[in-house]
């Protein structure tokens, strides 16, 4: 019985912390003069709490595992909702594909450039420089 209560407490604590960060993000987003989704701000809050080790990762792991396990199921209502606009998607298929391709290329270039900027050129141990 104690083990079952402990497991319930771990899941409850994880979901309370996840929702607390979400609602804190929504509250902060409502105060900002620019439009940033509250869920994004909530994820940043959760990231900061975990990165600064204010919040132990083991406290949110049980809830995260449940959400990841059922993530595909959570996307079904969104997919059904998008299909209500099938005629709009069909009419705008070309521009949607072009914008997806261009944005993917831009993301590749930005990640490549930033990775090169952050990591720079590293020398391999035992390798001599270019000599001519």
From Swiss-Prot:
The keyword Membrane applies. One of its GO terms (cellular component) is plasma membrane. Keywords: Cell inner membrane, Cell membrane, Membrane, Transmembrane, Transmembrane helix. Belongs to the UPF0299 family. It is a multi-pass membrane protein. It holds the Pfam family LrgA. The lineage of its organism: Bacteria, Pseudomonadati, Pseudomonadota, Gammaproteobacteria, Enterobacterales. NCBIfam families: PRK01821.1 (NF002494). It is found in: Cell inner membrane. It comes from the Bacteria. HAMAP family: UPF0299. The chain crosses the membrane at residues 8-28, 31-51, 63-83, 93-113. It comes from Enterobacter sp. (strain 638). This is UPF0299 membrane protein Ent638_2744.
